[in-house]
Amino acid sequence: MNIGKHVEEILRKQGRSASWLASQIPCERTNVYNIFKRKSLDVRLLMRISVVLEHDFFKELSEEAFPRKR
C-alpha cells in the first residue's frame, strides 16, 4: 500500500482539502502534498492523520501485512 496516496484518497472522499489537513496536524500545506507522495510515514505522523481523519490506517496496513487465510 502506498500510504501517502491512500491518505490523499481518504481525504478527498471526505471532501476535505490539503489545506484543511495541514491546519489539523499542523504543518504547512506543501508538507501535506509531500505526504501524499510518500510510500511510508512516521508512526506519530500517521497517528495524527488517523485521528483527524477518523480513519484507522494502522488496521489497513496490518491487514495488508497479515492477510486472513480463507
Label each region the model flagged.
Residues 1-20:
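A short, Lys/Arg-rich alpha-helix, primarily the initiator
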Residues 44-60:
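DNA major-groove recognition helix of helix-turn-helix/homeodomain DNA-binding modules
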Residues 9, 14-15, 34, 59-70:
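Short, charged recognition helix plus adjacent turn
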Residues 12, 23, 51:
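Alpha-helical residues within the helix-turn-helix
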Residues 26-41:
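Recognition helix of helix-turn-helix/homeodomain-like DNA-binding domains
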